[in-house]
Amino acid sequence: MRLISAKKFAKDGKIRFKEFYRNNIPSYAILSHTWEDGEEVTFEDCKPPVAKDKKGYKKIQNTCRLAIGDGIDYVWIDTCCIDKSSSAELTEAINSMYQWYQQAKVCYAYLSDFQGGNLKDCRWFSRGWTLQELIAPKIVQFFDRSWKNAGDKMSLLKQLSAVTNIDAGILSHQVPLSSACVAKRFSWAAKRRTTRDEDLAYCLLGIFNINMPMLYGEGRKAFTRLQEEIIRTTNDLSIFAWTWRGSWDGRPYLSFLAEGPDDFTWCSNLTLRTDPLVNEYEMAITNKGIHMQGPHWVSEYKDGAIRYSLSLQCANKDEPHRPILIPMRKAGPNIFMRAAKSGRMDVSLGITSSYPINSKSFTLLTRLPREQLTSGSLVSIFRHVAVAVEFPSDVPKLGVHGIPQKHWDVEDAVFFGPDSAVRRWGCVRPSGMGGEMLVCFWHKSNNDWEFQGTILNSSEEGMDGLMQDLFVFAEALDYPAEVVEGVLRRHGVRVGQKSLQVRYGGKKFRVAFTVERVNDRKICFGPHFKIKVSRLPID
């Protein structure tokens, strides 16, 4: 750490540095301020007479004067104590910045545009770097444009909390910073700005106790990297609680990672419902996106829509019993995109009922493929072949269960698969009917696709073993289609059966299905079979 000798500076106005290392760093004062373009004294400017010609020289003068008055021999100022021509030194400094402010004996916050009035109008509260400079040090003394004392952090605590939306307990160090969920911490940086896009991420490293290399030139990718590093260190799902704040361009789906702190503006009142260390989720960054272990949900909305959703294990502190869920769109085998609606995320609003899907794992996409397609939709390009199943209108949509779950999309009520010669299968069983169940097979043959369906009654005597084989073993062990067909035959099922009689509510019905080849690029990019199941009473 490179420090300025305050006493030597006071004697002759020359900036002299002394380097210290972790075990022998003396007490020091630290300056927090907003930079003036071209007027700050940099490390290269410290040799006279260049330094004295810049306005920033007075900041060094006053910081040293205040430090000497407080009995402190050394000061640290970000403009001149870092050799920014050295990328290694700059990286070390930025990664250490929070700790340096935290360990300072006192922090002098110079508000260059404050001369009485309302603190919230000061530029200091709108800059990215000053966020950690307010939180990290225990003692912060504020000075107006004339370097007159304007109060300290404790005397201004209530006002500072109101201006920044940061809990007073965190500002006063009575409550640990880690007690605030990830989304809440991001919300403190909302509407703050930095000169360079990358610094919107780099200025938050200390807030999340993260270290990562500096890559100036990467632009907003820095904020993506920051979120990925946070995910590597915590299971706090509130990181997905952001809402889209950019210009709405009609995109129906988004990445699961936010584009910047502004997306977290609404999250200042969020609180965790469970400790991330003991919640039922695990997250890992992969080359596809975020690999999740834990449940996700199927939710029904007031408008009748069925959507997948992810519970974020957090809630608004004013509604602690209402968990926040975000809608998802299934794009591939247990692969999800984030669904958007009318330019903002639908966070549990309008949900009437939900049930969990306890899949082994699923993936949240952090990068989407081509956003503009000449035909079809972003969903359909993941599906080369689809089998849609339509049941009578009185069958509740939320009660239709399909396996394998990874190839069944509840929202569209379709099985989907890739362009492959491998034979595929799917089994769908609705609640609210007479026990009927549809098993489907499809495969590519001679450059075309063939479909075969079998309808059976799962409530018949002796079917318990079949149900276990299909809904437990076939699902868990990922049976291929040939094995599933063998299971059906072993249990006496006539493969290819297209109709049967069932008893439901004391009446007899004939249940049958029809197969139609359709073309719907919104559902599927390739072959699309539409299966319509009918149920007619038998007199």
Locations of regions flagged by a protein language model:
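Alpha-helical interaction elements in eukaryotic regulators
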Residues: 56, 90-93, 97-100, 127, ...
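General structural concept
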Residues: 39-96
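Extracellular/periplasmic catalytic domains that process cell-envelope and extracellular macromolecules
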Residues: 21-27, 100-103, 123-124
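Long, low-complexity, serine/threonine/proline-rich intrinsically disordered regulatory regions
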Residues: 3-11, 27, 34-50, 70, ...
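Short amphipathic alpha-helices and their capping/turn segments at secondary-structure boundaries
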Residues: 16-24, 63-66
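Intrinsically disordered, low-complexity acidic/Ser/Thr-rich segments used as protein-protein interaction/activation
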Residues: 16-21, 86-89, 109-123, 192
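Amphipathic alpha-helical interaction motifs in eukaryotic regulatory proteins
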Residues: 32, 61-69, 95-98, 102, ...
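Short acidic catalytic loops
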Residues: 31, 67-87, 101, 107-113, ...
